[in-house]
């Protein structure tokens, strides 16, 4: 059964591919790691020339490019892409440190779908990517995880929270509960046991969809504010893991 937009879905689906074009190694790594932590497949190149070479052999779902690049700039890159029928429809987001206020108009005129000024937060990047390439954009940041869980205190040892957001979670289990049923779920997060009351909004049985884990998407109905704050912090730390700045302190 299909899942609502704001509740995490099962894993194992094919990852969408994003290309990051940035000559600044730190910025390129930051953007790449955040996108990977959100579950996307990412390739990073440092120039427009490298980007065009790569685009000749692979077509990404999205290109995120710096305007200021060594050699060709982002405007030239977008112009070359628009002239190539194979990649002309690939959306381009410009994410730049360029201080020139006229840059936005120039990039939009060249064909970029969105213009972002650095630094860009992980939440803003997530929502931008969701809005552009996902069929059902999600309002809440969700991250993949693997937390041992217990539903109604009867954990079998084979139930895990595999995706989590501020609004809900996906529980991987061979025994999904009935749609609309409410359950007490506990899971360990950073050495603390979190208890939530959650309702089943959609399920996947074993073998129903080969690309989906069996289990259930659950919406939080009741959760302590302190526990919700822990989940928010965990999500922030998860999507910033591996970046030069690392998780926020």
Which residue stretches match the model-derived regions?
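Structured alpha-helical
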Residues: 1-249
